[in-house]
């Protein structure tokens, strides 16, 4: 018996996800800072959705539109107060489709 093997890339699976953006009400906010903490800076590398990036002034910004709500940023930064994280309002956020 032969089993067909299909190679599906992670990016292709993630593309199946859908996002309902709550315009003007992001569920993640980065607290104002002069210089990012080590953990906040780490989010620019470890966020699987790449929601965090450095701006021209060297500060970390978040664009929560593609957030997968995995909680990585909560584990790294919420206790220190670097970010403010809330669940999206009902009907908004990520809709996983593992097609």
UniProtKB/Swiss-Prot annotation:
**Where does this protein come from, organism-wise?**
Rhizobium leguminosarum bv. phaseoli
This protein's source sits in the domain of life called Bacteria
Tell me which family the UniProt entry assigns to this protein: To ferredoxins from P.putida and C.tartarivorum, ferredoxin I from A.vinelandii, ferredoxin II from D.desulfuricans.
Report the function annotation for this chain: Could be a 3Fe-4S cluster-containing protein.
Locate the 4Fe-4S ferredoxin-type domain: which residues? Answer: 58-88
Query: Which InterPro entries does this chain map to?
Result: 4Fe4S_Fe-S-bd, 4Fe4S_Fe_S_CS, ETF-QO/FixX_C, Fd_FixX
**Does the keyword field hold Iron?**
yes
Alphabetically ordered keywords of this record:
Electron transport, Iron, Iron-sulfur, Metal-binding, Nitrogen fixation, Transport
Q: What is this protein called?
A: Ferredoxin-like protein
Molecular function as annotated in GO: iron ion binding; iron-sulfur cluster binding
One Pfam family name is Fer4_ETF_QO
The record's annotation in PROSITE patterns points to: 4FE4S_FER_1 (PS00198), 4FE4S_FER_2 (PS51379)
One Gene Ontology biological process: nitrogen fixation
Identify the SUPFAM superfamilies for this entry.
4Fe-4S ferredoxins
């Amino acid at each position: 018996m032969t089993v067909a093997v299909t190679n599906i890339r992670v990016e292709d699976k993630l593309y199946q996800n859908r996002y309902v953006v709550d315009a003007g009400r992001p569920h993640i906010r980065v607290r104002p800072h002069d210089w990012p903490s080590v953990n906040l800076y780490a989010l620019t590398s470890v966020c699987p959705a790449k929601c965090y990036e450095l701006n021209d002034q060297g500060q970390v910004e978040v664009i929560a539109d593609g957030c997968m709500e995995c909680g990585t940023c909560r584990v790294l930064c919420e206790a220190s107060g670097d970010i403010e994280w809330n669940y999206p309002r009902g009907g908004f956020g990520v809709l996983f489709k593992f097609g």
